[in-house]
Amino acid sequence: MKKIGVVGIVITQKNKEEILAMQVVLGEFSDIIVGRMGIPREGINAIALIVEGTVERISALTGKLGKFENISVKSALAVTME
């Protein structure tokens, strides 16, 4: 069963290698990413992803992103899609 929700990503320290690796992960999960908004700030960046997929697939995305040292990830899933 699919859910729709938001994944919040906060990058606390810019590290080119980590950011490139994060982009690869996002590409791997592009099938569940409906929208993306990034807010660049000095010293910190925030990205909001709108996602639609199974809980398992969304959890796999947040799990991979959460392994990066300078990236914090939280998700909120709200609606069950039929």
Please state what every model-predicted region is.
Residues 1-82:
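Long, contiguous binding/interaction regions
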